[in-house]
Amino acid sequence: MSDLKLGINIDHVATIREARYRLEKLAEPNVLFCANEAIRGGADSITAHLREDRRHIQNHDIVTLKENLNVPLNLEMANVQEIVDFAIEIKPKFICLVPEKRNELTTEGGINAVSHEKDLAKTIKRLKDAGIMVSLFIDPDLDQIRSSVNCGANMVELHTGTYANALNNEAMDIEIQRLVLASEMAHEEGLQVNAGHGITSANLEGLFEVPFLSELNVGHHLIARALVIGLRETVLKFKEKMLKYANN
């Protein structure tokens, strides 16, 4: 098998920023800086989800990332006219079309390519005509693979959330087999196969059984781990500066 690439989803860097500094351009944490730190650590691409409600990533983030990254930008988005038009203007290298509900905490499952095949095909054609490679975020289901092909997608991203949330080994094995079959079929149909959602250090190795994977997209887990791993040093350095108070 070829080397497996890692895409880092930086949405939750923006989540932290928006919780405190929604309208301030110099707010922290800086999304571009954090994206570049991920790249220095070995990230092969950066993913950002521009949601309709703009709860974390904003339009200006996408523009800044596109103009400054030295790795591909993968823009996640719903099939919504306004965001499609924006994407065609910005032209990220990759777009991943995902389902979206306003009341969800995060994307809850794959897009239904079977039910929305005609609408998706129109959007995918527009995006591909603009020189953008298009992926569909789908559940590991063979009918969804067939419809992804019919839509004209270049790639699929297999939803690994059900695998990640499996409560026991038997359930995990069932989900791995679904992913294996979906990946094999997608590969046979000429689609690049990526995977993402809920992937952690604890469940990563189970995915090594899935053939033909090109890239894993991981976000929340790595951002959360970065907070834990980096918090001690950050507090230590801050406290060192505070010691100067006694010397004034």
What role is predicted for each listed range?
Residues 1-75, 80-82, 86-92, 150, ...:
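Conserved N-terminal beta1-alpha1 strand-loop-helix module at the mouth
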Residues 4-10, 46-48, 73-75, 95-97, ...:
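Hydrophobic faces of well-ordered beta-strands that scaffold small-molecule active sites
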Residues 66, 168-172, 225-247:
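C-terminal helical cap(s) of enzyme catalytic domains, especially alpha/beta-barrels
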Residues 81-89, 141-151, 195, 199-213:
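Catalytic cores of alpha/beta
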